Each structure stands twice: as structure tokens, then as C-alpha cells.
Regions:
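The feature marks proteins involved in alpha-glucan
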Residues: 1-18, 44-45, 51-56, 64-170, ...
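Carbohydrate-binding surface patches
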Residues: 15, 19-31, 591-631
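Conserved, mostly hydrophobic/aromatic
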Residues: 25, 84, 143, 193, ...
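C-terminal beta-strand-rich structural cap/linker in extracellular carbohydrate-active enzymes
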Residues: 27, 79-80, 652-679
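C-terminal accessory region downstream of the catalytic core in glycan-modifying enzymes
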Residues: 38, 500-505, 509, 550, ...
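Conserved alpha/beta catalytic core and glycan-binding cleft of carbohydrate-active enzymes
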Residues: 114, 349-526, 530-531, 539-541, ...
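Substrate-binding/active-site clefts of carbohydrate-active enzymes
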Residues: 146-327, 337-357, 361, 373
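Glycan-recognition and catalytic regions of carbohydrate-active enzymes
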Residues: 508, 514-520, 524-536, 549-615, ...
Length: 785
């Protein structure tokens, strides 16, 4: 253990300089280690693999006492291929790719020495991260690189590639934005990319040409070379430098649009053990074992990385630091984060925020894929106060129901979920979160049925929609998937002339509308704003482009849906009251008004950074219109979100204290303090104390017909203070008490009542305190019209 601890500060991998390259690798049990250099990537077999590595030029490596083997080659090796030759105690000889390699040949068969400065695109040194003040300011958008552009209707030159994200100015036949400009117009702050490190299950040599509709497809949760970009997204996987440059171009293009990049990382398992990145160098060390000495399987794919071990922890932290520094990655989403011990997660967050960038975002799945012997699992609750967030499956279930079946939630028609939805909308601070920035709120992501398909299934519409039955990327009964998707009718029943009237559309907007109007960090699945379908495939990890590709033609067909998403995101970004960072803020400024009969209503009041003093959000899960009482106020209400449109502009104003909310819809209103309701009487109380000690004094009023409760005094000229409130038309008498703070003291022993004469526009009352000099209080009435 002392040996291992001393290794955790050593820089491993290949360090390339013009004068020479240093190689360092940790292989503690090896008898001999040699560096093998090659001029070519080797001979590929039919499976796209290089299995013969005997042709390299060998260099002896020296071992120090810590199990680290080193070699220096005194020349510029940029672009040279390399491997490590490992001789074990039993005499066996194996070749291994450097787990710290930053470039590899096609399909990751050999490492490549690279001078990373030569991979930088123009403008890279001037790249800056878009501003992010706090995690709850984020709006996340989960997206697969290939899905984004591969369909022919995208009109992109670099379909399926990193470079598709650099293509600006694209429009459809009706002038709607496509691709990169679409993301900017939508308003998301972060694009969360599914795995972009080198993964195993796609042969980069099979149909890698731009726009190829090859069957080769995978989400990428099968890691091979953790510190290298995936080659199938490059325009030429045979060029080991090009994939690095093109990924940097992607990040540069998104940053230029004000969009940050989150990387989906999989440090819980590798695709294989024997042929994976670690086992040949440190047999038995990197993988977790059960009590019988067998590989544990908490990932569900046959192995788990032993993150609690020092050199595994070092590897993960080094890898994350590399991506954040070299690629300017802005955040990380951790797959099956419960398989990463909490000590490692805490160190990741604290060290990278302290030493790289304080605004880096960290979040992940707080569950496993099976039983694990790890005792210190990063599950819901373990994130409290630690600076990272977790996916909120409680909220997800309350909104939509189960993942793949007919189970329903609030947005899909089930009663009794109001309380669970309210809990989620309050940032789950009374559930598992200490603060709202610890919960990632979402309805669907890449796993399971996507939102549109889930709504169809939950509402019993799958046969009408012609949803497919698929498993492992194939139709259950055989056949061509492209033909099957073309014959499917997932949008049957949506009238082209009035998209927003369809119940399924309204349910989809209700579901993600709840997410976007909740405290916490919202996450959307790419294409939800276009009513994206995966044709009923609940596990499309290898189902190919026919199922997974985003259909950009949906934008002009469902433009009102896109506009609604765009408006909700703009509303959230414009008003800090929707993005509170601390539980104390929520407890002070958020009040639940109603949570029953499939109606949820809450108000946000007097948030100090928000220009709107009072905001009311109403969610109607009924299929019919419901009437909801609004909080009393002397001002008119301005509606900015209804069942047809959303944003920050006023749709309609109203004087009434009730509102009719259409079925399956959202309503957002704010108190417009520039427009006072008609027929109100202003009541002004002028309060005088000889000691002029007005701090904490307020007037408690009731019977106003507008807004009852405490009204603070504000100091005015002449050593006096003034409180102003309003009485509704027809009010005859208003009660009041002058008190200190929350009833610590009061003026007089009896309640006071103020008569409100009809037709009076203003009533003034003057009070002289009896508390500071012992004299009798004096009262003077001044009626003013």
C-alpha cells in the first residue's frame, strides 16, 4: 500500500516533446516491460482488429520501487504508434495499449504518441467557457452525436460526425433553424453528449464515411480507451489526430453559441476484462471482486471497476482532469454512479472545482445495474452538501409513471400524484436533497421509452401508432427496420391545423413543462421539442439510425411545440425565482397554494433577484377545464404561459381573482405592479414614534378583500413611517393591529377597525405611538379622493 500511495502523484502515460518523449506505465507485477514503437497501425483482420504486434522496435523500460516502468526516447515521436510488451512471472508475454494513451489507431488497437498542441483548431487557445453562475442556471440537453445529424433530412454535410456541430446557418424549407442554430434558438445551456470516448462495439472501419447508414451503431457505454475520442464520429478514423481536432471543433462551436458541453463518462465498468485497458498491466487489481473472489457484476455487464482502490481512483481523477483541461469539457455525467465510492466522488468534485474550474458541473445516476459488494455507494442522499447532483427518479415516476409499461403518472392521467409532483417541484428538499442544486429533474433520457412513446403506451395508443416490437436492435418478428419505421404512424390523431389540441401533445408539454418550472436542474432528452419518437423501442442502444436518428422535418410540422419549449426555457432563464440555489430560499419564497384534484398551484414571492414580485404557476392534470383561485393582490395578473404559448411576454391581463385553466395544461401568471386593479381604495397608515425606532414594526391587516397579512412600515420624512395597503371595491371595514415583528409587542390592547367609505380612492390614518412615552395614542383620519 505504501508503494501504491507513492504512485498516486506520478504522471503516467506518454509525454511528447520535440526533444524527446517520456513513457511511464504502472505494471506492479510485471517481470519485464518493454516499449514497442511502430511506424504503422498494423494489419487489420476482418473484424477490424490488429492482433499481431510483434513487428515493433523494442526499448527496455526501467522499474522503480513503486511498480512504475519508465523509458525515454530522445527524438520527436509525434504520430508514432506504440504498445507496452509485458512479461509476467509465469513467462507469458502480452501486449497492452497504454491506458493513459491520448490518441489511438482505428478501433483503439495501438496507442499513438501525440503532441496535443498540433491537434488544436484555430481559435482554441482563445476559447472560454460560457458563463455559469450556479448549477440551477443550467438547462441540460442529452444528445447522441450520430443521432443529431445522421438523417438525410438534416441537410448537413458531415452527417453523423463531430463536425456536424460546426455547421451553422442551416434552415429547412420554411426557414426554421436546424442543427447547431436550433440548439442556440431553443436556449439550452448545456449539451450533454452520450459517450464520446473510444468505445468498443462499433467497428470504426465499417461504413465510417460521412453520412453512412451502416448498421454499426451504439450508445457507447462500453469503454475501451478512456482518454481518446471515439473514432467513428471522425471524418477519418485512420487519422489518430483528426478525431481530437474535430471534437475540439465541436466544443469550440458550441461554446461560441454560449452552450457548454457535458461528457457522459463510464468509470464503473469496461467492455471486457481480459482485453480491456487494465488487466494486462495490473492483473486482478482494477476490478472489484465479491466474497468468493469472483468478478462482481453491479454494472450488469460482467465487471465493476474497484474505484475505492488508490490507483483506480487516481486513474479516474486523472482522466477527468485531462478532459476538463485539454478539451475544455464543462461537466460530467456519471453512468451508474452508485458503483463509484463516495470518497472518490467527493475528491473528484472538490479537486476539479478547486484546481480546474469552479463552475464544472457534476451529476449522475445514483443506482447500480445489479448487486455490488461496494459498501460506500453513491446513492440518493449521499450527495448532500457535496457539490454534485443526482438523477431524480422519484420525480420522474411521479410525472410519467413507470419506464416502459402502461403505468401512469400525473402527466399521463393517474390521480393521487399531486403530492409527489409538488415535492419534486420544490427541488426535493424534503426528500433526498439538501439543496435544489442536488437534483437533476427529468422525465425521459436515452434509456427506456422516450417521452412521446411513453405517452402513447401509457394512454393505450400503441396499436393506433403502429409502434414496433424490437430487441437488441432487431424487429422481434424479423424484417427491415427502415421499412417498419416508415410504415409506423406515431403521430396519428394529431391534426395538422391544430397540433396543440391533441391530448398526447398536451401531455408531453405538461410533463416537461413541470420539469422546466421546478426548482433544481432540468434535463431534456434531445428531440422532445420535436415530438421525437423511437417507434416504441425501449432500449435502442444498438438499433441504428432508422430508430434513433432525429427527424428534423418534424420541426416545421410541430413548430408550435418547439416554440412552447423555447418559451418555457426563456422564462426560466429570465427569472431567478425559478432557479433558486438553496433550500432556505425555497422555504422563504415558494408557497404551495393547492395540491388536490389533479391541480397543482404554487407561488413564488418577493425573490430579491427577480423583477416579478409574485409569480403563480398552475398545473392542470385533468382533461377538462378547472377554475383556480389566485392569491389576493391589488394589481392585475399578467398571463405569460397558457395552453397555447409560453414565454416572458404578456398574453393577457385580468382583474379577477380566479382563472379558468384548460385541461392538460400549464398556466404562469405574474403580479403586474404597473397595473392596479380598478375600484381599489388605498389605505395609508402614517405611524409616529418619538424614539423613531421603526425597525420590525408592521401593521397586520385583515378583511381587505385584496391581500391580508403583515405590511411593513417604511421610514418617511419628518421622523415618521408609512404603510400602504389596499381594500377591494365594496369593502366596508378593515381590521388592523400595529405590531413588532411577529407579535413580540403591539400598540394598544384592542383591535382597530378602519371604515372604508364608498367611492373613496384613498383613506389616510395617522397614529402616534403610546409605547415610547406613555401618553395616550392619537388618531387622525384624512379622507382623500
Amino acid at each position: 500500500m505504501d508503494m501504491i500511495k507513492s504512485c498516486t502523484s506520478v504522471k503516467l502515460g506518454a509525454t511528447c516533446r520535440r526533444e524527446g518523449t517520456t513513457f511511464q506505465v504502472w505494471a506492479p507485477d510485471a517481470v519485464h516491460v518493454k516499449l514497442a514503437l511502430y511506424e504503422s497501425p498494423g494489419e487489420y483482420n476482418e473484424q477490424g482488429l490488429v492482433t499481431d504486434h510483434e513487428s515493433g522496435t523494442l526499448y527496455l523500460m526501467e522499474r522503480n520501487g513503486d511498480g512504475i516502468w519508465s523509458a525515454v526516447v530522445n527524438r520527436d515521436l509525434h504520430g508514432t504508434y506504440y504498445m507496452y510488451q509485458i512479461e509476467s512471472a509465469d513467462g507469458g508475454v502480452h501486449y497492452a495499449v497504454d491506458p493513459y494513451a491520448t490518441a489511438v489507431s482505428a478501433n483503439g488497437c495501438r496507442g499513438v504518441v501525440v503532441d496535443l498542441a498540433k491537434s488544436n483548431p484555430p481559435g482554441w487557445e482563445q476559447d472560454v467557457r460560457p458563463k455559469l453562475l450556479k448549477p440551477t442556471d443550467a438547462v441540460l440537453y442529452e444528445l447522441h452525436v450520430r443521432d443529431f445529424s445522421i438523417h438525410t433530412d438534416s441537410g448537413m454535410k458531415y452527417r453523423g460526425k463531430y463536425k456536424a456541430f460546426t455547421e451553422g446557418g442551416l434552415r429547412d424549407s420554411e426557414g426554421n433553424t436546424i442543427g447547431l442554430d436550433h440548439l442556440e434558438e431553443l436556449g439550452v445551456t448545456h449539451v450533454h453528449l452520450l459517450p464520446i470516448f473510444d468505445f468498443r462495439t462499433v467497428n470504426e472501419l465499417d461504413g465510417y464515411a460521412t453520412g453512412s447508414l451502416s448498421r454499426e451503431y451504439n450508445w457507447g457505454y462500453d469503454p475501451q480507451n478512456y482518454n481518446v475520442p471515439e473514432g467513428s464520429y471522425s471524418t477519418d478514423p485512420m487519422d489518430p489526430i483528426l478525431r481530437i481536432r474535430e471534437l475540439k471543433e465541436l466544443i469550440l462551436a458550441l461554446h461560441a453559441k454560449g452552450i457548454r458541453v457535458v461528457m457522459d463518462v463510464v468509470y464503473n465498468h469496461t467492455y471486457t476484462v481480459d482485453d480491456g485497458p487494465f488487466e494486462r498491466l495490473a492483473p486482478g487489481y482494477f476490478y472489484r471482486k465479491d466474497g468468493y473472489g469472483h468478478l462482481s457484476n453491479g454494472s450488469g455487464v460482467g465487471n465493476e471497476l474497484a474505484t475505492e482502490k488508490p490507483m483506480v481512483r487516481k486513474y479516474i481523477k486523472d482522466s477527468l482532469r485531462y478532459w476538463a483541461e485539454e478539451y475544455h469539457i464543462d461537466g460530467f455525467r456519471f453512468d451508474l454512479m452508485a458503483l463509484i465510492d463516495t470518497t472518490t466522488m467527493k475528491e473528484i468534485v472538490s479537486e476539479l472545482r478547486r484546481e480546474v474550474d469552479s463552475s464544472l458541473l457534476f451529476y449522475g445516476e445514483p443506482w447500480t445495474g445489479g448487486m455490488s459488494p461496494l459498501t460506500e455507494q453513491t446513492v440518493k442522499g449521499s450527495q448532500k452538501g457535496q457539490g454534485f447532483a443526482v438523477f431524480n427518479d422519484h420525480f420522474r415516476h411521479a410525472i410519467k409513471g413507470d419506464n416502459d409499461g402502461h403505468g401512469r403518472g400525473f402527466a399521463t392521467g393517474e390521480p393521487w400524484y399531486e403530492g409527489a409532483v409538488v415535492e419534486g417541484m420544490m427541488g426535493s428538499i424534503h426528500d433526498f436533497a439538501l439543496h435544489p442544486d442536488e437534483t437533476v429533474n427529468y422525465v425521459t433520457v436515452h434509456d427506456n421509452l422516450n417521452l412521446w412513446d411513453k405517452i402513447l403506451v401509457a394512454c393505450g395508443m400503441e396499436e393506433q401508432a403502429g409502434l414496433l416490437r424490437m430487441t437488441d436492435g432487431k424487429l422481434v418478428n424479423g424484417g427491415d427496420v427502415w421499412k417498419a419505421t416508415a410504415a409506423s404512424t406515431p403521430y396519428a390523431g394529431i391534426p395538422d391545423e391544430d397540433v396543440m389540441s391533441a391530448a398526447a401533445v398536451r401531455r408531453s408539454l405538461l410533463a416537461n413543462g413541470i420539469v422546466l418550472l421546478s426548482q433544481g436542474i432540468p434535463l431534456l432528452h434531445a428531440g422532445d421539442e420535436l415530438l421525437r419518437t423511437k417507434f416504441g423501442d425501449h432500449n435502442s442502444y444498438r438499433s441504428g439510425d432508422a430508430v434513433n436518428a432525429i427527424r428534423w422535418s418534424n420541426k416545421k410540422r410541430f413548430k408550435p411545440v418547439f416554440d412552447y419549449y423555447k418559451g418555457l426555457i426563456a422564462l426560466r432563464k429570465a427569472h431567478p425565482a425559478f432557479r433558486m440555489a438553496a433550500r432556505e430560499e425555497i422555504e422563504e419564497h415558494m408557497e404551495v397554494l393547492r395540491s388536490s384534484d389533479r391541480i397543482i398551484a404554487y407561488r413564488l414571492t418577493h425573490h430579491p433577484q427577480d423583477s416579478w414580485g409574485q409569480i403563480v404557476v398552475i398545473v392542470n392534470g385533468n382533461e377538462h377545464e378547472m377554475t383556480v383561485d389566485l392569491p389576493p393582490t391589488p394589481y392585475r395578473w399578467s398571463i405569460v404561459v397558457n395552453d397555447r404559448q409560453a414565454g416572458t411576454d404578456t398574453i393577457k391581463t385580468l382583474d379577477q381573482g380566479v382563472i379558468a385553466v384548460p385541461g392538460l395544461s400549464l398556466m404562469v401568471l405574474y403580479e403586474d405592479q404597473t397595473q392596479k386593479k380598478q375600484g381599489l381604495t388605498t389605505v395609508e397608515i402614517e405611524y409616529e414614534r418619538r424614539d423613531e425606532a421603526y425597525d420590525g414594526w408592521n401593521v397586520w391587516v385583515w378583511g381587505t378583500g385584496v391581500e391580508d397579512g403583515g405590511v411593513p412600515f417604511s421610514r418617511v420624512d419628518g421622523g415618521k413611517a408609512r404603510a400602504v395597503f389596499y381594500a377591494a371595491s365594496g369593502t366596508k371595514r378593515v381590521g388592523c393591529i400595529v405590531r413588532l415583528n411577529d407579535w413580540e409587542d403591539r400598540e394598544g390592547e384592542n383591535d382597530w377597525f378602519i371604515d372604508i367609505p364608498p367611492e373613496e380612492a384613498k383613506v389616510r390614518i395617522s397614529l402616534l405611538s403610546v409605547k415610547d412615552d406613555g401618553s395616550e395614542g392619537q388618531e387622525q383620519r384624512d379622507m382623500a379622493s
